[in-house]
């Protein structure tokens, strides 16, 4: 049986080196991370170099694996521009165990501060950054016992991480990513992760996976607000009905009510603040792509603690969730879809924050607010079909 053909990485396969000029001075802070035990002083691969290589790979669709990354290190172009030397496969694989992702996270946050939300008069009344929160699953190449999970919807075994993401929708940037095992239970449950990471003065936009009175109470106590989609089976006690305006009706709002949710007999924790239930007419649908996911009966039910905003604006805030879905689509292409360079927790967070930085660099260099067309253009490029589209 013939052996596998060695895949060659050429100069033209490596892209994005010019875009990395802005971030390299920031990466230089990482040089000493993980060197505390290197008493002999013979370390050849440092964290700033490793992160530069990961960033380069995310700009280069041809680099699909750690072995491809190793071959790219042998190119004079890469060694000269990034200041790296040849690295062994073992060094690239094992070095992440001593690299702390926290300093890289700080760099991503600092870079994010340079991207400002563009004024949007429609949402000015919100008075808080609008933060869509959701999670996406990325599979590991190797099977890792502690990451083992069999989701009911798919019915197949997964070894994967869940990346819990906070996405500032008006500026188009992810501001936080936390990696946990994919199974949504215990400390890895999306509601538990968000409750640990709540910040003050934010407007959190949440899907049905974040239904939790305890979580909503915590968000309210932190001085933040939320707009969360409720279950189709939500039952509420109406205490006041708000009159709909013409703008509300034009936005397909059916009802706007102040409500009490929950019963002491069923719920350990009850809401401790005023809540509002807004119903919006939408197109009914079955489970997504034939999977046993939640259906929609034609009414979108939104729960919020913002009693001051028009109902139509609450509906528009929730519609902004499409941005994080498009971000995940692009983000997964940056991560190579199912290909993570490392199955170690540190390595996954480093790669996730590098992908986050690349998305920010795209925003900085294009100078445009993200929209569907921009995300689709980047997505086509990353899957290698942009060139064929241009030729056609």
For the regions a language model picked out, list residue spans one by one.
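Single, function-defining residue in the core of a domain
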Residues: 1-68, 72, 85, 96-99, ...
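Short, positively charged patches
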Residues: 150-151
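A short, well-structured juxtamembrane/interface segment
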Residues: 113-120
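Blade-loop segments of beta-propeller domains
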Residues: 75-83
């Amino acid at each position: 049986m013939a052996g596998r053909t060695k895949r060659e990485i050429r100069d033209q396969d490596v892209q994005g080196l010019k875009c990395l000029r802005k971030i390299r001075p920031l990466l230089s802070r990482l040089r000493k991370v993980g060197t505390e035990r290197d008493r002999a002083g013979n370390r050849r691969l440092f964290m700033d170099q490793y992160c530069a290589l990961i960033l380069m790979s995310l700009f280069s669709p041809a680099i699909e694996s750690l072995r491809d990354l190793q071959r790219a290190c042998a190119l004079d172009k890469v060694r000269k521009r990034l200041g790296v030397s040849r690295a062994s496969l073992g060094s690239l694989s094992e070095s992440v165990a001593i690299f702390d992702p926290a300093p890289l996270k700080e760099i991503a946050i600092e870079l994010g501060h340079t991207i400002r939300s563009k004024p949007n008069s429609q949402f000015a009344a919100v008075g808080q950054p609008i933060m869509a929160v959701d999670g996406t699953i990325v599979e590991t190449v190797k099977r890792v016992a502690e990451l083992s999970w069999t989701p009911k919807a798919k019915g197949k075994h997964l070894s994967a991480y869940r990346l819990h993401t906070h996405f500032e929708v008006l500026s188009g940037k992810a501001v936080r990513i936390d990696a946990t095992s994919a199974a949504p239970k215990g400390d890895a449950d999306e509601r538990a992760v968000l409750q640990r990471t709540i910040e003050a003065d934010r407007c959190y936009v949440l899907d049905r996976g974040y239904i939790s009175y305890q979580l909503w109470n915590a968000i309210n106590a932190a001085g933040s607000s939320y707009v969360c989609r409720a279950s189709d089976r939500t039952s509420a006690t109406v205490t006041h009905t708000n009159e709909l305006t013409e703008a509300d009706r034009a936005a397909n709002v059916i009802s706007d009510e102040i409500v009490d949710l929950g019963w002491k007999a069923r719920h350990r924790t009850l809401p401790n603040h005023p809540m509002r239930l807004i119903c919006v007419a939408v197109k009914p649908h079955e489970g997504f792509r034939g999977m046993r996911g939640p259906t929609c009966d034609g009414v979108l039910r939104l729960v919020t603690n913002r009693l001051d905003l028009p109902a139509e604006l609450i509906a528009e805030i929730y519609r902004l969730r499409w941005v994080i879905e498009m971000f995940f689509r692009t983000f997964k292409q940056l991560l190579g879809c199912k290909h993570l360079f490392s199955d170690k927790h540190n390595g996954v967070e480093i790669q996730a924050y590098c992908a986050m930085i690349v998305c920010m660099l795209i925003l900085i260099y294009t100078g445009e607010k993200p929209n569907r067309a921009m995300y689709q253009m980047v997505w086509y490029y990353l899957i290698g079909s942009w060139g064929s589209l241009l030729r056609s």
